[in-house]
C-alpha cells in the first residue's frame, strides 16, 4: 500500500469522509460559544473549538473502531471499516489516536486552566464510551454526556466559569443526542442482537418511537429554557419551531423501523441542529 492509499485509509478511519458526526458535535458547541459570549465569541476561542471538534470527533471514531474491531466485521454497515477489514492494524489506530489526541490537547493548552481540566475529563469519557456497549443497555446516554462535554468547556473558555445556564444547554443536547443516536442504533438493531452489542434501540424495544419522542420533547424544553435564560427573542423562537418540525419529520421516518428511513432520520438531525444554531446567531444580530 503506497503512502496515498495509506493516508486515505487513515482518513476513513477518522471518518473524515463522513462529516455528519462532526456537524452534530459542532452546532451545540457553537451555540454554547454564542450564548456564553452574548453573541460575539472570541475569534481565538472560536477557532480552537472548531478545530477541536473536528479532531476530537476523529479521536472518538478511532477509539470506537478499535474497541469494536472484532465485532464490526459481523455487522453489514461496519464490516468495511479499516480496522474490521484489516486495512489498518490496532497498533496503527492507537498511534493515530494518540497523535490526534495530543494535537487536541495542544489546542486546549492555549486556553485557561479550567478548560484544560475539563478537557482531561472529556478525553477520559471519550475513551470509556466505546466499552459501555459491552456492559450497559444505555450507551447512548453515556454518549450524550461525551457529545455534550464541549458545552461546559465552551462556557469556561469564554467566561472562565461554567454558569448554571450552561447546564440547560448541556441537558438539551444530552436529550437530543440520546434521541438521534437511538435512531442510529435502530439501523443496526438486528445485527447488534446477533453479536451482543447493547443499545437503547434494543432496550426500548417496541416503545422505541415513543421514548425517542419523549427525549425530543425534553430536548425541546431544555433548548427553550436555555434561550429564556439568555433572554433570546423571536428569531430563536422560530428556530425552536423549525426544530419541532424536523423532529416530527424524523418520527415519520422511523415509524416503520426500516433501516434506510431510520438512517435518514438520524442524518436529518444535522439540519435540525443547523437551523437552531442559525436562528440563535440571527437572533443576536438583530
Swiss-Prot record:
It holds the Pfam family UbiA. Its EC number is 2.5.1.39. One of its GO terms (cellular component) is plasma membrane. The gene is ubiA. This is 4-hydroxybenzoate octaprenyltransferase. It is found in: Cell inner membrane. It is a multi-pass membrane protein. The chain crosses the membrane at residues 20-40, 43-63, 95-115, 142-162, 167-187, 210-230, 234-254. GO terms for molecular function: 4-hydroxybenzoate polyprenyltransferase activity. It comes from the Bacteria. Keywords: Cell inner membrane, Cell membrane, Magnesium, Membrane, Transferase, Transmembrane, Transmembrane helix, Ubiquinone biosynthesis. Pathway: Cofactor biosynthesis; ubiquinone biosynthesis. GO terms for biological process: ubiquinone biosynthetic process. It comes from Shewanella sediminis (strain HAW-EB3). PANTHER family: 4-HYDROXYBENZOATE POLYPRENYLTRANSFERASE, MITOCHONDRIAL (PTHR11048:SF28), PRENYLTRANSFERASES (PTHR11048). It catalyses: all-trans-octaprenyl diphosphate + 4-hydroxybenzoate = 4-hydroxy-3-(all-trans-octaprenyl)benzoate + diphosphate. Belongs to the UbiA prenyltransferase family. InterPro entries: HB_polyprenyltransferase-like, Prenyltransferase, UbiA_prenyltransferase, UbiA_prenylTrfase_CS, UbiA_sf. Catalyzes the prenylation of para-hydroxybenzoate (PHB) with an all-trans polyprenyl group. Mediates the second step in the final reaction sequence of ubiquinone-8 (UQ-8) biosynthesis, which is the condensation of the polyisoprenoid side chain with PHB, generating the first membrane-bound Q intermediate 3-octaprenyl-4-hydroxybenzoate. Its cofactor is Mg(2+).
